Amino acid sequence: MNVIEIPFVEKVGIQRNTDGELELPFNIGVQNHLETIHASAQFALAETASGEILQKSFSDLEGKVVPVLRESQIKFIKPANTKIVACPSVSAESLSRFEEQISEKGRALISVDVHLKDIKGQLTCTGTFKWFVQRIETGQMH
């Protein structure tokens, strides 16, 4: 699945840049009352990037598991008044623990950190997204 084709993601205006990163252009459609990027639009970009890094990290599980966002923490550092880019990351330890849990139990939790940066490279927002992922029982979906 291409995350930028998810209807909500399209509606928000999240795009992929030439470096393959997810970004949110600065335009009136995502502005708040202060004419900066709305908090919910920043959250949408960060959450989408967190899901995509898991999809890329575990591409062999696509169609075999259901990922659900279980918990999130977000901190807005400075107003975003330019295009912003998402920079997601997962620690090697978390990746290893996830692989072990999903293999042994058929379900696992994993946390993804995301930094949003403006065109000057300044941090506008940070977030941690905890995903619950469970294997699909045969015949359960599709």
Residue locations for each model-derived region?
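Short structured motifs
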Residues: 10-14, 70-76, 97-99
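Intrinsic-disorder/low-complexity, polar/charged segments enriched in Ser/Thr/Lys/Arg/Asp/Glu/Gln
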Residues: 19-23, 71, 83-85, 109-111, ...
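Hydrophobic beta-strand-centered segment that forms part of the acyl-chain substrate-binding groove
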Residues: 53-93
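HotDog/MaoC-like acyl-thioester-processing domains
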Residues: 81, 91-142
